[in-house]
Every structure is written in C-alpha cells, then in structure tokens.
Amino acid sequence: MSRTKRPHNIRKPAPDLIVIVTEGEKTEPNYFKKFPVYSIEFSVIGTGMNTISLIKEAEIQVEIQIDKFKEKYGEEPQETIVWCVFDKDSFSDEDFGNAINKAKAKGYKVAYSNEAFELWYLLHFHYYDMALGRDDYIVKLTEHLKRKYRKNDLFMYEILLSRQEKAIKNA
C-alpha cells in the first residue's frame, strides 16, 4: 500500500493569535498563562494600567505580538483575538464606559470584575450576587482554600482547575 505524499509547496496555514492584556502585572498573567493552549499562539501581557490607558496599551501590544508572529510564521495570523482584562475599581462610570466602548470599537473583547480579579477565583466556589470588597475577597478565599490566600500564587490555576466549570456557571 503506497502512501500519498503531500506536495512540498503546500504549507499549513498559520495559526490564530490570542492576546490577553491585563491590568494586573502578576495575578491575572499568572492565571492566564497556565491555560492549556494548543495550535494557536497565545500571549498574556500584564500592564499595571487601567481603563482607557490599558486599551491604548493593548493597541501597542497587539502590534508587537503580530510582528513577533510574522517573524515566526512568515505571515499574518488567520485571526487575532484580543481580550482586555481590568477591574471596575473606583473609576467613574464614564471612564469605565469609555474604555469598554473603545475596546469594542477596536474589536477587542472585555472581561472585568467589579472590584478585583479575585472575584473570579471566588466564583470557583460559590455564586455571589452581593457586593463584596477587596478585603472580603481575601478572607473568603482563605476560607475556601483552607490556607492563606497569596495574591500572586503561581499555582492558582492548578488549584482552581477542577472547579472551573462551576466558576463559568457562576459568572
């Protein structure tokens, strides 16, 4: 039985590119970088910026990541998906709304938490429909984890992975 050979001039198409630009410099990137990602290029950039400045930085970072992609594959990605992740914090509704509108106008997706990314961690355990402050997040996470919550824990993704479906439903 002979094998069919693929012609040498047919190349596999370039994969997709996903860029996640976060407000947090460590907590969010530590979590997102643990996602099991195959057959796509995946980049997570923690900026320390928020709202409009984060969206502006995302524009810069997307161009940088596309340039890196082109160097690696010799062509543009099939699709570039951009996520901007930030906290609502105490920003005015106008600033917050402007950031979301600017991101959407660029075709970026937005994920935000009411006060801190740790709310996402809490949703792995319970549904919350009441206001919680940052200090409450830490106390509740410490209770659920049965150990002191450490903000920039490199293993938080692995710790929470078995509860990820619950978090998605609770979100």
Identify the residue ranges that each predicted region occupies:
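Short, surface-exposed ligand-recognition loops at beta-strand->loop->(often short) alpha-helix junctions
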Residues: 22
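Phosphate/oxyanion-binding active-site loops and adjacent basic polyanion-contact surfaces
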Residues: 47-58
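C-terminal accessory helical subdomains adjacent to catalytic cores in phosphodiester-
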Residues: 3-19, 29-45, 67-83, 88-171
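Short acidic, Gly/Ser-rich segments with clustered Asp/Glu that frequently serve as metal-coordination loops
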Residues: 25-27
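Glycine-rich, highly charged phosphate/nucleotide-binding loops
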Residues: 58-69
